[in-house]
Amino acid sequence: ADFPMLGYNKNWVAISVNMFTVAGSAFSSGSVFVVDYPTLRTGIASPTVFSGISSASGGFCAHPAETYSSSEATLYLVSHLSSGSATYKLSTITGTAAAPVYTVGATNTRTGGGWATSGGNIMPQTCTSSCPGTLALIDPGDQFHRNNVVFRNGFVWYAQTIRLPSSTPTHTAVQWTKLTASTGLFSDGGRIEDPTATATNGGKWYGHPSIAVNKNNDVLLGFTEGESDDFLDAAYAFRLSTDAAGTMQDVVVFKDGEDYYEKDFGSGRQRWGDYSHAVVDPSDDVTFWTIQEYAKLRAAPTVGGS
């Protein structure tokens, strides 16, 4: 099992995982562990397991929603299907707390056109005079909904990293989507993008988004900003519920990167920002928080001699 993804509502806590074969490490299917929440609160966890969910059925990275409702009885799960076709599924868990039922959703198309698949070491960064001979690029995340999904006031929200333009991609962007929960259909969405960006011209790349929605339907997107002439920055964008459809306000860099990042743990992949997140403060259900990654300044090397 790999990459656990968490969601919940009043009836269940759900954890979805991607299952891989031992030989060859190939994706085999998705599994969702659904725990009776009322029973869990007594200290007992006995999950119902829905296994063998194929890629075609949305089994890969089927992310359950964080459900901000005390009455919503359906737990929603979003799955990305095709980048070029901009397709997705909105599946559901229904039934009683003790007897959940998993239903694979219909295949729907996101409005706004397709994109190229993301992932791998593609996001640029700069380095200092002490950098290695060949500075590795960064993996900005793929097109799957890995960081979080949110249910709020009858809508399901999620964000993902995409590559654009779809035919000959030159950069990554952050894409956010709002679905009508009852139908699974696209309601609103937009992109944080610098359409002029390439891997060498100093244009802005965006990746690893996470999303939060407050009680007023205001939205915060947290993400990484990268450029060929700068370190990786922690950033966010915000929209009020009254802002024009499909728009976000200007990007804010709230923490500048201090140095380059190079750490692949022997995998060859420069993973970055996998578990960044955005949330609403439970004390007022209005204030937003986001946690994003940046690289600290390297300590100066110790120089000695005799």
Where are these regions (language model features)?
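C-terminal PAP-associated
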Residues: 1-306
